[in-house]
A protein has these predicted regions:
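Basic, amphipathic N-terminal segments that precede the first structured/catalytic domain
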Residues: 1-67
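Short secondary-structure capping micro-motifs at structural edges
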Residues: 54-63, 67-74, 96-103, 116-121
Length: 175
């Protein structure tokens, strides 16, 4: 039986110009280091480049319930907007760290669709990257790969990509 050939994901580096345009149109710009450490990242030397804090944008624009949204977005050199969800706390609280709680596929789908709906009224001048990046801590990355492989199963083009903070920074901010 022939296996389906999965397309490779091509990720473009961070674009200061596009991100500045997005930050101007959406407001809620925040230094990457502040956002990642606020989400639970434990990496040193995180750049100060600006990203858009989508959770803050969602809180500011929703009248009722806060829509489910990704944590951040930024512009890339291929004129696409990269959506990123931080999942550093899948290990739970201190006592429960041994049992990992994966994000559900439905939860991730809702975050992407709610984010796109939140941004749909804005003329952003760029499309969305086809992949949602999921950032995990180093100690959870192997399990995260298994989850993401399950989420992408049967898809010709992957919809999710797992990364550690170091991989993320090397791919987008130190290419």
């Amino acid at each position: 039986m022939a296996q389906k050939k999965r397309l490779q994901i091509s990720l473009a580096p961070y674009s200061t110009e596009l991100t500045k345009v997005l930050a101007h149109k959406l407001s809620h710009a925040k230094p990457l280091s502040d956002l990642l450490t606020g989400e639970g990242a434990k990496t040193n030397a995180i750049p100060q480049d600006l990203v858009v804090d989508v959770d803050a944008l969602a809180r500011a624009t929703s009248l009722g319930d806060k829509p489910s949204s990704v944590d951040m977005l930024f512009g890339c050199t291929n004129n696409l907007i990269q959506l990123v969800e931080c999942k550093y706390r899948v290990g739970g609280k201190k006592r429960d760290r041994k049992s990992l709680t994966p994000p559900t596929k439905r939860e991730l789908e809702n975050k992407v669709s709610d984010t796109k709906q939140l941004l749909s009224r804005k003329d952003l001048g760029a499309g969305f990257a086809p992949v949602l990046l999921l950032l995990f801590s180093d100690r959870h990355i192997e399990q995260a790969r298994a989850w993401v492989n399950d989420y992408n199963a049967g898809k010709k083009t992957p919809l999710y990509k797992e990364m550690t903070t170091t991989d993320f920074l090397d791919t987008f901010f130190h290419p």
